[in-house]
């Protein structure tokens, strides 16, 4: 368990106040499809 999500791990684009683990440094959370709440941590 780490405090940040590694590349390829699931993430939440819009948390709406939910407890979430941010992507690690240098990664961004890209949604699976436009408007999706969930995505995957990827490099810029």
Swiss-Prot record:
Q: Where is this site: May be important for binding to chitin?
A: 9
One Pfam family of this protein, by short name? Tachystatin_A
- In Gene Ontology terms, what is a biological process of this protein? killing of cells of another organism
Q: In which tissues is it expressed?
A: Granular hemocytes, small secretory granules.
Superkingdom per UniProt: Eukaryota
Q: Which cysteines are joined by disulfide bonds?
A: 4-24, 11-29, 23-41
The compartments listed are:
Secreted
Where is this protein chiefly located? secreted
- Keywords from the UniProt entry: Antibiotic, Antimicrobial, Disulfide bond, Fungicide, Knottin, Secreted
> What InterPro entries is this protein classified in?
Antimicrobial_tachystatin_A (IPR022717)
Any single GO CC term annotated in Swiss-Prot or TrEMBL for this entry: extracellular region
Q: Does the keyword RNA-binding apply?
A: no
Asked if the Swiss-Prot or TrEMBL record annotates the protein with the keyword Disulfide bond, the reply is yes
The record ties this protein, via SUPFAM superfamilies, to: omega toxin-like
Domain observations: The presence of a 'disulfide through disulfide knot' structurally defines this protein as a knottin.
Q: What does this protein do?
A: Exhibits stronger antimicrobial activity against the Gram-positive bacteria (S.aureus (IC(50) is 4.2 ug/ml)) and fungi (C.albicans (IC(50) is 3.0 ug/ml) and P.pastoris (IC(50) is 0.5 ug/ml)) than Gram-negative bacteria (E.coli (IC(50) is 25 ug/ml)). Binds to chitin (8.4 uM are required to obtain 50% of binding). Does not cause hemolysis on sheep erythrocytes. Has no blocking activity on the P-type calcium channel.
Q: What is this protein called?
A: Tachystatin-A1
